[in-house]
């Protein structure tokens, strides 16, 4: 909570389930007697006892986002924000950004656009994660997210309607094939039917899209989160079963599987197809396919990792997660670095989301044109989509 003469500005920081090893540090108490070790009293104390007094004494205006973020980074002094915790720094950074917009008397998305030097704003295409697997779900499915992108919609409002209708058609398709309990939802609001074959998930999507009557307006995206099932240079597509190295497949075999998906289904975007350090596989794959290849665990919204990925031509789109890097200023830098190198950028939520809607304004202000913030289900996901609907009405 940040108070200025204009009122109260509040931010909440999300948390990820499948985190990349190069992400900024999320500071937890590790006191097993409280919240299973996941308490954040240390991070909160850093805000109240160190960061807040410093910002108040320096008397910097809340519109000076970069100055405030730089001050916090200097005070922390570590490479990955391990002293204060990225969760402490980001909470303040987000609240400052909201306060800055109010100080200027403009909507948050305009303030963000100003900070990024964008004269215009753009509404995004939503990527709805409607089938969940991987570390987000209790099924056997290895690949983490299967998304629908209503690229043929004329407006965000229409995109929401298409997404909702396909989602409910998918629910019926799954119920008919696997029974009612297969329609329980995963962390991000998507369904998590107990299937093993990743192709089966694509088949279910294709079916639901056709039933809803939108086969001409929707394309499919995937987030494989392959770092979660990388084993000794190979990949285990049945990683939730007892370990058996004989079933591991090579990066080339995995790449061929992706190519078969692209050939047989309208798959136009694949995120984290390989492990976060399997640079050779990324490079080879991106050069050989004409689709969007998104870096998440690979790039962790970190300008240094992005620069390496640009040099290596490892991918062609950045997944932007504010809590991977831990400040608004660095998030804008990461976005601009990617865009200036001709990459796409997709703004993203985390599996452990909050009701905070900052990323809805962020995606509009940064003009990235793409956002993924879950299925049209669960209010912490819908909060973001509803905020974009409101922004569209305003514009």
Swiss-Prot record:
Keyword Lyase on entry: yes
Binding site for substrate: 136, 145, 271, 296, 348-351, 372
Sequence positions that bind Mg(2+): 223, 271, 296
Main location (coarse class): cytoplasm
Textual note on the cofactor: Mg(2+) is required for catalysis and for stabilizing the dimer.
Active site: 188, 321
PROSITE patterns cross-referenced by the UniProt entry: ENOLASE
Needed co-factor(s): Mg(2+)
Organism superkingdom: Eukaryota
GO biological process: glycolytic process
InterPro entries found in the cross-reference section: Enolase, Enolase-like_C_sf, Enolase-like_N, Enolase_C, Enolase_CS, Enolase_N
Reactions that this protein is recorded to catalyse: (2R)-2-phosphoglycerate = phosphoenolpyruvate + H2O
Coiled coil: none
A GO term from the CC aspect: phosphopyruvate hydratase complex
Enzyme class name: lyase
Compartments where found: Cytoplasm
UniProt KW keywords: Cytoplasm, Glycolysis, Lyase, Magnesium, Metal-binding
Oligomer and partners: Homodimer.
NCBIfam families in UniProt: eno
Family, as annotated: Belongs to the enolase family.
Protein name: Enolase
Organism taxonomic ancestry: Eukaryota, Metazoa, Chordata, Craniata, Vertebrata
């Amino acid at each position: 909570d940040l108070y200025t003469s204009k009122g109260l500005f509040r931010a909440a920081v999300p948390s990820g389930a499948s985190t990349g090893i190069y992400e900024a540090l999320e500071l937890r108490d590790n006191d097993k007697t409280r919240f299973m070790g996941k308490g954040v009293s240390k991070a909160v104390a850093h805000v109240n006892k160190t960061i807040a007094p410093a910002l108040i004494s320096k008397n910097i205006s809340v519109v000076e986002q970069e100055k405030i973020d730089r001050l916090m980074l200097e005070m922390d002094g570590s490479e990955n924000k391990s002293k204060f915790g990225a969760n402490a720094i980001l909470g303040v950074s987000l609240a400052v950004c909201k306060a800055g917009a109010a100080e200027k008397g403009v909507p948050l998305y305009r303030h963000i656009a100003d900070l990024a030097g964008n004269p215009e704003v753009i509404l995004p295409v939503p990527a709805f994660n409607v089938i969940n697997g991987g570390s987000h779900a209790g099924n056997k499915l290895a690949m983490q997210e299967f998304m629908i992108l209503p690229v043929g919609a004329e407006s965000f409002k229409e995109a929401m309607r298409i997404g909702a209708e396909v989602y409910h058609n998918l629910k019926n398709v799954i119920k008919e094939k696997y029974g009612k309990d297969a329609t329980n939802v995963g962390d991000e609001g998507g369904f998590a039917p107990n299937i093993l074959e990743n192709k089966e998930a694509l088949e279910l999507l294709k079916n639901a899209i056709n039933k809803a009557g939108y086969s001409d307006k929707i394309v499919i995206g995937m987030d494989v989160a392959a770092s979660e099932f990388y084993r000794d240079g190979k990949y285990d597509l049945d990683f939730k079963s007892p370990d058996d190295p004989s079933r591991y497949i090579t990066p080339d075999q995995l790449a061929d599987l992706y190519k078969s998906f692209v050939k047989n289904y309208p798959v136009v975007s694949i995120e984290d197809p390989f492990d976060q350090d399997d640079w050779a596989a990324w490079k080879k794959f991106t050069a050989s396919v004409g689709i969007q290849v998104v870096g998440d665990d690979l790039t962790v919204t970190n300008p240094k990792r992005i620069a390496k990925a640009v040099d290596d031509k490892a991918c062609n789109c950045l997944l932007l997660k504010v809590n991977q890097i831990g400040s608004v200023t660095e998030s804008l830098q990461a976005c601009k670095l990617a865009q200036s190198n001709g990459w796409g950028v997709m703004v993203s939520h985390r599996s452990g989301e909050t009701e905070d809607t900052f990323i809805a304004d962020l995606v509009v202000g940064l003009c990235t044109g793409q956002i993924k913030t879950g299925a049209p289900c669960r209010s912490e996901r819908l909060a973001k989509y509803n905020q974009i609907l409101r922004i569209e009405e305003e514009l």
